[in-house]
Amino acid sequence: MNKYIRDKLRLPAITLAVVLSLLSHSLCAQDTLSLLVPEAEKEFLQNNFSLLAAKYNIDANRALIKQARLWDNPILSTDQNIYDQQGFFKHNNNSGQVYVQVSQLIKTAGKRNKLATLAQDNTTLAIDQFDDLLRTLRFSLISDLFEVEHQLKIKKVYDSEIAQLEILVKGMDAQLQAGNISVKDNMRVKALLFNLQNELVNIEAAIIPLESEIHLLLNNGHDSAFIKPVLGYHLPDLINTTLPERQQLIQQALATRPDGKAARTQLDYQSHNLAYQKALAKPDVNIGTEFDQHSSYSPNYIGLAVSLPLNILNRNKGNIANAQYSIRQQQAILDGQNQRISSEVNAAVDQILFYQKVNNLQQLEFSQQYDTLFQNMLSSYQQRQVSLLEFIDFTDAYKDSKLKLLDQHTALIKALLELNFQVGKDVITINK
């Protein structure tokens, strides 16, 4: 029976050992790049391709502002005879025909300025979209850095417990050979170690996509390096931090959030578009001068040409109505956006207050005491002062408690990050 148990556990143990070895080798083989949050933000601003593309979009829209202000080019028209009864290209004063006209389109009702205003609105919208992209990607970067640190803390809990159990298992193997303990007790502890090692594999695997996203955001040329965040927050300060008034936070969010600004810019665009569509209903004037050598009633005729469309069949009423309805539509979108911003800020504040209540300084003291108690329990089991069942139960409870505390601490930090994100500026300093 004992041999059967050993055979059953041998294969999964060997498999897990291989997986752990490969993962550990992969993590250890990587160069470790310790990175402060300000350094990460600097590299992100300099190197991120999405931000670079958005900057070019702003420049492209600015070029259209200059283009919209330009006048239309003058038009040169000419009509010259090729052949008449006297021969080819006879353009002297006595025979032949030459006709030349130069005309210029003059846009009325301030169409050029109104079109330039629309181009300016598009540029402002591109800036708002850039700022919103920056806000979103920065939030993703900082969240990923804090999440990597969270996973590394979890890994540290497992590493510490696994290291202690490996020492214990090594000693128990010697005791088993001496016949001082049973195979069952030896296998129970090894099974506990096996489960912890298996859970550690999942923790290390969870870090890989986070690192990949951080590398993608930073684009700093260190794709093969393991980025280890260096964070400077003090948890007791975060637990006791006092938030600004809700209404103040909401007003700040409404004023500063780029997506809110973008909605207001789009409303401005629709208002300016209505003015432009009304201007399009006004006819433009084409003015020119012409010279006619022989075709007119008088030789060498010089005249003034004026033309304009008659505003009878098309007064641009459809586009004007479309612009009016677009204003109403965008106003509804803006009202909904403002309501959503207020709701998101309120939810972020509620989360912080909840996790500040859940986390407390007594928990930090309890965690430190629990670490000491784990060492005492390990020593007591080695000295046969507690049973195997008590030791295993305590080990599971110790691990679960440590992980729950870490999750609660990280939840508070994420809630604070979320508030900064929803307001659109750092109202709470987390990393010092």
Segment roles from a protein language model:
Residues 2-16:
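Bacterial N-terminal signal peptides that target proteins for export
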Residues 3-6, 30, 41, 222, ...:
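Acidic, low-complexity, intrinsically disordered peripheral segments
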Residues 29-75, 80, 88, 105-106, ...:
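Bacterial Sec-pathway N-terminal export signals of envelope proteins
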Residues 30-34, 77-111, 115, 230-243, ...:
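Small/polar, glycine/serine/threonine/aspartate-rich low-complexity segments that form flexible
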Residues 53-65, 133, 137-158, 167, ...:
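Amphipathic alpha-helical coiled-coil segments
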